[in-house]
Curated annotation (Swiss-Prot):
Binding positions (GTP 1): 11-18, 58-62, 120-123
Annotated organism of origin: Natranaerobius thermophilus (strain ATCC BAA-1301 / DSM 18059 / JW/NM-WN-LF)
GO biological process: ribosome biogenesis
Name of the protein: GTPase Der
The KH-like domain, residue ranges: 354-438
Assembly with partners or alone: Associates with the 50S ribosomal subunit.
Similarity comment: family membership: Belongs to the TRAFAC class TrmE-Era-EngA-EngB-Septin-like GTPase superfamily. EngA (Der) GTPase family.
Statement: the UniProt record of this protein carries the keyword Nucleotide-binding: yes
């Protein structure tokens, strides 16, 4: 497996970062509005240009409207320096250079990473707008219109020219090694959990360069199985950005999950399920990762005989999209139940890689359809001719049907539940895709 390079968009609110993000990613997955500081849920996407692909993050998406603008731009620049291979500093040509732009520039000048200045909203006067922004001290300045697409091709040419010559290759990992990311909000105990695992598992532990960058993975060998904890160095170092900006944890979680098969989502049980917990859980599902939910700081909870059941039900209620994920109660601080993580990891890894025979898949789908036929849509009814599994990690099934548009989400969930009932799939999302059955 290889890791794509990362490009970060930086800039004050309302300079057009969202419009440029959408232009590069090629689909409208973020809100574009003229109100300064409009926030978005989606902050990552995939960019492709001239045969190169890269991860794209919009650092502006990690802020709320009420955040101070100067605080925003400085932290954006720090996030970009921390996470990106190439930084695109987006400005507004019509406004000229503002104090916030100067703050960003001052921070970015401290890095050795390549910085491109994209002077947006330069319609009608591209050369003149670009000249002013050379004052910020960067060599490459390009005037663009993200809205109309003018010169965005030139910008992308420059971006791919600056990307690392090769994708970061993972070293010495075997397909059977279990790749794990520890994800969650700041201060939920991620570094404590890693340290406790390493202290408890007095086994073969080695630190490996996870990529040709400076990420360090920790490899544990246990009963002939290798477990690779991704970027443990990054987890152990306290990020000043994390401390000041909780939403930065979403970017960190995205990056950790890119290389993992299974994500361990750590939640502080004393705080309950917060919005960032929900976002990070949703990312794990969206990216098709196996998932284990770890309720940390269980030692700090006053317990009666029903405490475990109560918290279990709360998690299921608050995180319905990942109701397949096993839930564990533990204390990273005291080590309680930490040693029980590995058998659950083994189980989820097996389920994530599970393959079902075509005959068994069709038997379950046929029984499900006979028991509850597909609902009609505009007077037409979905017909499912046959099904087969086409991928693992996550398990993915294709249904050959008369018309994919007749598949309702509610019926797809019903079929997913029937597959789970028959085959398990604990801890892993499953995908169902529809294809038109070709006539002979």
């Amino acid at each position: 497996m290889s890791v794509k390079a990362t490009v970060a968009l930086v800039g004050r609110p309302n300079v057009g970062k969202s419009a440029l993000f959408n232009r590069i990613v090629g689909q409208r997955i973020s809100i574009v509005d003229d109100t300064p500081g409009v926030t978005r849920d989606r902050i990552d996407g995939k960019g492709e240009w001239s045969g190169h692909s890269f991860n794209l993050i919009d650092t502006g998406g990690i802020f709320d409207e009420e955040d101070d603008i100067l605080k925003q731009v400085v932290i954006q620049a720090e996030v970009a320096i921390d996470e990106a291979d190439v930084i695109v500093f987006v400005t507004d040509g019509r406004d000229g250079i503002t104090p916030a732009d100067e703050e960003v520039a001052a921070t970015l000048r401290k890095t050795k990473k390549p910085v491109l200045v994209a002077v947006n909203k330069s319609e009608g006067n591209y050369d003149q707008y670009a000249m002013e922004f050379y004052q910020l001290g960067f060599e490459q300045v390009i005037s663009i219109s993200a809205l109309h697409g003018t010169n965005t091709g030139q910008l992308l040419d420059e971006i791919v020219e600056l990307l690392p010559e090769q994708e970061y290759e993972e070293l010495n990992y075997h397909e059977d090694d279990i790749m794990l990311s520890v994800i969650g909000r700041p201060n939920v105990g991620k570094s404590s959990l890693i340290n406790k695992i390493l202290n408890k598992e007095r086994l073969i532990v080695s630190n490996m360069p996870g990529t040709t960058r400076d990420a360090i993975d920790t490899v544990i060998e246990r009963e002939d199985q290798k477990y690779v904890f991704i970027d443990t160095a990054g987890l152990r170092k306290k990020s000043k950005i994390d401390e000041r900006l909780e939403k930065y944890s979403v970017i960190r979680s995205i990056k950790g999950m890119e290389r993992s098969n299974i994500a361990l989502l750590l939640i502080d049980v004393t705080k309950g399920i917060l919005e960032q917990d929900k976002k990070i859980a949703g990312l794990a599902e969206e990216k098709g990762k196996g998932l284990i939910i770890l309720l940390n700081k269980w030692d700090a909870i006053e317990k009666d005989g029903k405490a475990g059941d109560k918290y279990y039900e709360t998690v299921r209620l608050e995180l319905p999209s990942v109701n397949y994920a096993p839930i564990m109660f533990l204390s990273a601080q005291t080590g309680k139940n930490v040693e029980k993580i590995f058998p659950v990891i083994d189980k989820v890894s097996k389920e994530h890689s599970k393959r079902i025979t075509t005959a068994d898949v069709n038997r379950v789908i046929e029984d499900a359809v006979n028991y509850t036929p597909p609902p009609s849509k505009k007077g037409k009814r979905l017909k499912i001719y046959y099904a087969t599994q086409v991928r693992t990690r996550p398990p993915t099934f294709v249904l050959f049907v008369n018309n994919p548009e007749l598949m309702k989400n509610s019926y797809k969930r019903y079929l997913q539940n029937q597959l789970r009932r028959a085959f398990g799939f604990e801890g892993t999302p499953i995908r169902i895709l529809e294809r038109v059955k070709q006539r002979r």
